[in-house]
Design a protein with these regions (language model features):
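Membrane-proximal envelope and lipid/glycan-remodeling enzymes
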Residues: 1-406
Length: 406
């Protein structure tokens, strides 16, 4: 037991050190930007206004580059509020929103997210090498790496949500009331960063009720989520008179849009954008789209790994992987259905994330992939899996640097 703990501690330390080094090197190449802050961190701006006793953004008309909602003549931060809460101590210490070391904070959140991935895999019974593999794949071999380089509002929302989701899955495997409550709180906080994580929370709560057949027995799992939902609904109502509106519908771009923020008319065009290829010309130059993304598994090959593993299990004569019980249904068909549903819901949004490298919205599906991975913890990465992970890290390092000049 002591030896196992030591091995896990060593592997986790090594992985976090690699991620920290990669981010420090990136910011060095970017011109020494680690301690700087992005002008797009409207969470910090909201925190500054909270500290001044306002739930709106004072002089919002001066921040023309930010995605601010306009409602009854006032300007409001238009994203769910949880990351803004995290900014409060930093803004209070710095004195103003633009003075915080935003990129360093983003790096810290990325390390916490990576720690959540490792802890989730470790509690699921995976070996240290497998835990390290998946942590590297998520933190450096996907769009998560590029989003970890900047404290812009969009990136903070996704990295925070993903981190909360993985820590939620970690606690959900604990099997007692205290850890059920912690899992519920973490997943609810993820919803407070990215609303589509409500699907993960709802499925987990539903699965707990199905297994325990008693509302009383799932109260520890239910209460934190209910309290968090009530707080966020009250905050929405105080600002917009609606418990479900956090501001995006009042963004000028969606007010002007013929079909609004969400519509079925966006579904097929956006799905096709997730299939746009990355090509190589005769001079060896890569070509890809940087608006609304490209082929979803090119920058996020974790999907490719899951698909290949799933297909191999269907081949005749292939040895089945040992399955274990996890806090959510881990059948391949169920996980695939949830990923498809999440993708369709995402593609019903007017945009797919705008300016970007890869397909960053697809990162929101990672917890579902890990539900499947956690159900099969005895698998260990072979040389081909490590090669895929290495290629993914190189491609995403390239992408992060490429976007510096775009």
């Amino acid at each position: 037991m002591k030896n196992s703990v030591k091995q896990h501690a060593s592997a986790l330390t090594a992985v976090l050190a690699c991620l920290a080094l990669a981010l420090v090197l990136y910011h060095s190449l970017a011109g020494g930007t680690l301690l700087q802050s992005s002008p797009y961190n409207s969470y910090a701006l909201q925190a500054e206004n909270w500290l001044a006793g306002r739930n709106n953004i004072a002089n919002g008309e001066n921040y023309t580059w930010l995605e601010l909602a306009i409602y009854q003549g006032r300007y409001y931060q238009s994203f769910p509020p949880v990351p803004a809460v995290l900014m409060l101590p930093f803004v209070a210490a710095a004195g103003e929103w633009s003075a915080i070391p935003g990129n360093l904070i983003a790096m810290g959140l990325a390390l916490l997210c990576a720690g959540g991935v490792y802890a989730c895999c470790m509690r699921g019974g995976m070996q240290p090498v497998t835990c390290a593999f998946f942590t590297l794949f998520v933190s450096m071999g996907s769009n998560v790496f590029w989003m970890s380089t900047n404290d812009g509002v969009w990136f903070l929302a996704q990295v925070c949500a993903l981190g909360f989701a993985f820590w939620g899955l970690f606690f959900a495997q604990g099997g007692n009331a205290v850890q059920d409550a912690a899992a519920s709180l973490c997943m609810a906080l993820a919803v407070g960063c990215r609303p589509f994580y409500a699907l993960l929370l709802a499925c987990w709560l539903g699965w707990q009720f199905y297994q325990r057949r008693s509302l009383k027995r799932i109260l520890p799992a239910l209460l934190p989520a209910v309290v968090m939902a009530a707080c966020m609904m009250a905050y929405n109502f105080a600002r917009f008179g609606s418990v479900t509106e956090f501001g995006h519908n009042y963004l000028p771009e969606f007010v002007r849009a013929e079909n609004g923020q969400f519509s079925l008319t966006y579904l097929v065009p956006n799905l096709l954008q997730l299939l746009r290829p990355v090509t190589l010309d005769a001079q060896g130059q890569l070509h890809f789209e940087i608006y609304n993304g490209f082929l979803f598994f090119a920058a996020n090959p974790l999907f490719l790994l899951a698909m290949v593993r799933g297909l191999l299990l269907r081949l005749p004569g292939h040895q089945a992987e040992v399955q274990v019980s996890v806090p959510l249904p881990s059948a391949g068909w169920f996980v695939a259905a949830m990923c498809l549903l999440m993708t369709c819901l995402t593609c019903m949004h007017r945009t797919l994330g705008g300016w970007q490298f890869g397909a960053r919205y697809m990162v929101d599906l990672f917890p579902w992939l890990f539900v499947w991975f956690l159900g099969r913890p005895k698998w260990r990465p072979d040389s081909s899996a490590w090669a895929l992970c290495g290629a993914a890290m190189l491609f995403n390092l390239y992408g992060a640097l490429y976007m510096l000049n775009t």
